[in-house]
Amino acid sequence: MTTQGGLVANRGRRFKWAIELSGPGGGSRGRSDRGSGQGDSLYPVGYLDKQVPDTSVQETDRILVEKRCWDIALGPLKQIPMNLFIMYMAGNTISIFPTMMVCMMAWRPIQALMAISATFKMLESSSQKFLQGLVYLIGNLMGLALAVYKCQSMGLLPTHASDWLAFIEPPERMEFSGGGLLL
């Protein structure tokens, strides 16, 4: 008796995934339950006779537009880690490769800032366009600041007094001294 009870309990657990399609407590309803009176033929699970209003499409489109606008706004900030890696790999020596890297690091943010009005037109459909535009602007300014810092660390910016010696007048001598002989 215990073995039969165990088998019945085991059988119930074993077919837990099965859907009971017949009977009044079943998972699916027949056409007779819907009032069509055509017998016991079954509809597929999840089928409805009524048309479901499609309001989720508009909400999904709005969410996708917001997500796309944030992707555009965060684009310059996503480039900063790669720029830091390129700065590290280029070194501080003045040669053609590091100079080209610095020029490209400076040119991309400048180009993006010159085309900022076209970018803001793409962000107009967003409800957070001001914040997204501000994030975009800050990201490009940070990229430009990294390029200026790299120029300074390479010694390309005139930040020391010795860089301006050509513009400084030589000091006037207050005294003249001669050799060690008296005449």
From Swiss-Prot:
Taxonomic lineage: Eukaryota, Metazoa, Chordata, Craniata, Vertebrata
Keyword entries, A-Z: Acetylation, Apoptosis, Endoplasmic reticulum, Membrane, Phosphoprotein, Transmembrane, Transmembrane helix
Topological relation to the membrane, as annotated: Multi-pass membrane protein
Quaternary structure note: Component of the ER membrane protein complex (EMC).
Domain of life: Eukaryota
Any GO BP annotation: tail-anchored membrane protein insertion into ER membrane
Modified residues (N-acetylthreonine): 2
Any Gene Ontology CC annotation: endoplasmic reticulum membrane
GO MF entries: membrane insertase activity
InterPro entries per the UniProt record, alphabetical: TMEM85/Emc4
Role of this protein: Part of the endoplasmic reticulum membrane protein complex (EMC) that enables the energy-independent insertion into endoplasmic reticulum membranes of newly synthesized membrane proteins. Preferentially accommodates proteins with transmembrane domains that are weakly hydrophobic or contain destabilizing features such as charged and aromatic residues. Involved in the cotranslational insertion of multi-pass membrane proteins in which stop-transfer membrane-anchor sequences become ER membrane spanning helices.
Residue numbers on the Lumenal membrane side: 88-98, 149-183
Entry's localization field: Endoplasmic reticulum membrane
Residues where Phosphoserine is found: 36
Family per record: Belongs to the EMC4 family.
Sequence ranges on the Cytoplasmic membrane side: 2-66, 121-127
Protein name per UniProt: ER membrane protein complex subunit 4
Transmembrane segments: 67-87, 99-120, 128-148
Keyword Transmembrane helix listed: yes
